[in-house]
Amino acid sequence: MAFLIDLLYTIVIFNKLSIENWHKRTLMRKEIDLNTWDRKEHFEFFSRNATPHYCVAFNVDVTNLLHFTRTNKLSFYYSLVYLCTQTVNEIDAFLMETEDNKVYAIDQRIASFIDLAKGSTVFHVVCLPQQQDIFAFCSQAREQSTNNPLTLQQSCQITDPKVIFSCLPWLDMTTCTNERDYTDAKLKDDTAPIIVWGKYIQKDGKFTLNMTLDVNHRLIDGYHVGQFAQKLQNIIDSLC
């Protein structure tokens, strides 16, 4: 009995320290001068809305990614999370957040994605910063998901800027909406992009999937969504 108590205590302390370590991370955050920002008018216009979010659906050719992950024995899901996070972190418009009508530039967003333990139908959360390469990310994602998964509440305690991911691999998804707390007075400061995709399907010798990107119009326009889609496709096509 004493052994079980000690074990449970160790698990609780380990999880507590894991969460606390996130708060110790130091990320660059620099306020943007709105008077010299070329999107000042757009920011102020869309700031009038309590919920300035919108969602765009588009198709992604994942043929090369599927071949790459099968050849290298990597998780397709973790790999696509990595590539999407990489893409987000290469576009300036996605590296901004707001607070009290101020805009800040940040240096990166971390991936926050759901996962399922084998045999379970109840998802947990994994939060992971960008790693040195796709192999390191997939390895670390597997380790975190297996040995140190986060509850929904724990993931909310991690204050690092995020890219939020979900996946519906059971159906050929065409689009989706995302839950939001419309009673939250600070909802318009929610600037975390939300990326969701469905299962990939084969047609005419290619594998494609539908992806949705949910963003905040105070910071991100359709042009930037187009940048994301094209850049992601280019990165996938360049895998070898």
Task: Provide a role label for each language-model segment.
Residues 4-7:
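Short hydrophobic targeting helices and cationic amphipathic motifs
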Residues 9-20, 24:
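Short, positively charged and aromatic/hydrophobic N-terminal segments
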Residues 29-57, 77, 152, 160-167, ...:
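Flexible, Gly/Pro-enriched loop and linker segments at secondary-structure and domain junctions
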Residues 32, 58, 68-72, 87:
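Aromatic-residue-lined binding/catalytic grooves and analogous aromatic/hydrophobic interfacial grooves
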Residues 49-67, 108-132, 208-214:
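Acyl/amide activation-and-transfer machinery of modular secondary-metabolite enzymes
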Residues 74-111:
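Hydrophobic "lid/gating" helix adjacent to the active-site nucleophile
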Residues 189-240:
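Active-site-proximal acidic secondary-structure segment that organizes catalysis
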